[in-house]
């Protein structure tokens, strides 16, 4: 696993985790600010992304395995008193790492992320049938249906597109999820970790790992995480973009259910999309 380790070794640790399909490059605007403030900033590339190794089988990229890799890194670096910042899948994986090593974390910042536990069991068969019935559409149609969110299952268009599209266009994914656009150089940077199809197992698999169906293997992990965070009294702060249709409302769930969130000031950033690190730095 590749990771950035910037700032003074004795500084208070900040661990920043990216999601799918980005990498540590996403934090290039934030890292210098944190380092200047005296923090030691650790920014891993999740396995399968960035400069980390890229196992070629989608089955290698289970949620549990990715949590384990992050926990192993934190323990090897012996990080203590961590401020965790997680966005997208970085949030889901990192929050579970907090559950597994709670004494190492001092506070949490959740950014455009969540802990979904699937549709109600009574709706599970319908969700599976809906997924089977939807066509594989082009990227633009996928984005439209994702936002439209018919039956509350629009995310399944995203799942199918990532799993089956002949060309998983990573720059398109990032570009279409920010409000302020990307330069040609930035788009090339997001494409660089994936020179051909053999490198894309992780970004293809991650959407399928999101618990939409109640029988998804990650459901027990995230339910256990909710039990933990419903008793979590350390500071828990939400920073969400107001123009992200994917995670809209997830901040309210965190604030309502987590004791440590109820005494904090939270931010909803105006004109900011899913990848708020790009839109708001």
Per-range role (PLM):
Residues 1, 6, 13, 26, ...:
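Flexible "cap/lid" subdomain of the alpha/beta-hydrolase fold that forms the substrate-access gate
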Residues 11-18:
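Short beta-strand element of the alpha/beta-hydrolase
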Residues 19, 88, 278-279:
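Conserved acidic functional residues
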Residues 20, 114, 275:
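Active-site pre-Tyr helix/loop in NAD(P)-dependent dehydrogenases
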Residues 272-281:
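Catalytic histidine-centered segment of alpha/beta-hydrolase-like enzymes
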